[in-house]
């Protein structure tokens, strides 16, 4: 429910959430951290995707979910993303953070995703 509620905020508040580019920059930095972690633990192979792409990609989602697998992805995302699905796109990153906020995990969000935390703070 919270996740879909987050997506309903995106259209009316698009400018506040995305327009300044700061959230996209934070997301890209995290994506590249994840790419480095995956490369390190998956035999030194660089994942065959553009980790700077902020939009959803079914191919990347399949790679993360099926080639890497969520069991390993949870470990690889630790300290980078609040959950593996947050890594799939900028919109999912926002929605996952929104969900964390509503579940009371603001401190984790503050430490791991300060830009996202400050965006969400505007709403609450």
Named regions from a protein language model:
Residues 1-124:
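Active-site-flanking segments in enzyme catalytic domains
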């Amino acid at each position: 429910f919270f996740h879909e509620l987050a997506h309903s905020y995106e259209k009316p508040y698009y400018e506040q959430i995305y327009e300044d580019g700061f959230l996209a920059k934070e997301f890209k930095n995290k994506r590249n951290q994840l790419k480095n972690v995956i490369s390190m633990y998956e035999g030194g192979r660089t994942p065959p995707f553009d980790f700077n792409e902020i939009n959803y990609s079914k191919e990347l989602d399949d790679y993360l979910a099926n080639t890497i697998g969520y069991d390993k992805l949870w470990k690889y995302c630790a300290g980078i993303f609040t959950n593996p699905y947050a890594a799939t796109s900028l919109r999912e990153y926002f929605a996952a953070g929104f969900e964390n906020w509503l579940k009371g995990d603001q401190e984790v969000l503050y430490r791991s995703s300060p830009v996202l935390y400050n965006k969400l703070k505007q709403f609450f």
